[in-house]
Amino acid sequence: MEALGGYPTKPSASRAGLIKVLLSVAVCMGSLYLLQSKLSKSQKAKDFYSYEVKDARGRTASLEFSFKWFNIICEVSLVVNVASGRELTEQNYRALQELHRERGTSHFNVLAFPCSQYGDTESGTSREIEAFDKSYYGVTLPIFSKIKIMGSEAEPAFRFITDSIQRIPKWTFWKFLVSPEGQVVRFWKPEEPIDDIRKEATALVRNIILKKRQEL
């Protein structure tokens, strides 16, 4: 009689091979999914509102949705690279706060992004910057996490803005008006009057309101 002890080896080896194949397939599928997600995200990021940003507390949210903790919806946005310790700070913050208060938060918002790449202008943490600006300048507009806007570590959302205008801000408080479609339509340097911005922003908001009335 032939010994049967060696026979179970083949099925066991075959089963182990099948498991390896299945694991390999699962890994490949997972890798493909991650790659597709990254590609989809990069393809989607064709406008400012396609990006994600962080607030001063480090919480992440997509710009295309409302910021629940700020109670805002991004439709028309004035994006500003701000700083707390410069000679233009108080003048610009007062003007931006006034504009933010005038237009409300239903269709228009001022979005402030602190940046410390222009000398020692923002040495504190994001939360310290937010607390200081609110207490000292009385701002209620949303202040986001401190970012870089120059170099390889530039914030992607801000890089979209600078790529759109083919210019890098030379100093703080450059202001960029973003349409409801997420495109940069105009920009202003820090010394330019806020009235020019007010006119452009009001025109965009008026178009939004008229369009919504027509859709009713």
Where are the regions a protein language model picked out?
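Thiol-based oxidoreductase modules, predominantly thioredoxin-like and allied folds used
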Residues: 104-126, 139-152
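Short, internal strand/loop/helix patches
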Residues: 127-172
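Thiol-/selenol-based redox modules, centered on thioredoxin-like
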Residues: 156-216
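N-terminal "domain-start" segment that seeds a small globular fold
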Residues: 32-67, 88-91
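Conserved helix-turn-beta segment immediately C-terminal to the redox Cys motif
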Residues: 70, 74-76, 85-114, 133-137
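Hydrophobic membrane-insertion alpha-helices, especially the h-region
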Residues: 19-34
